[in-house]
Amino acid sequence: MCYTLCITVRFEWDEEKDVANQRKHGVDFESAARVFADPDYVLREDRTDEGGEMRWHAIGLVEAVLLLVVHVYRSSIDGEEIIRIISARRTRKQERRGYFQ
């Protein structure tokens, strides 16, 4: 038996942080959101921030570039899942190894 599950996910981010991230890492958050479209993306816990939210790392391919996206999960009032992007950059060597294993 096979089920198809369709979930609407909304992405959000701080626009100023997006501009700063582009300057620092050369990755914009709109492109970073595409990591979640990679069927083989890898998800790992990062840490809990000062506000008590659990941060996550998603690693996935976007246009043949392997990116790491730091994000948190939130829910809207109507129950829609929200992924808030905090930062994004190209992966480091050890992070790439974890993706391709």
Language-model-detected regions and their locations in the chain:
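Ribonuclease/tRNase effector modules and their secretory precursors
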Residues: M1-Q101
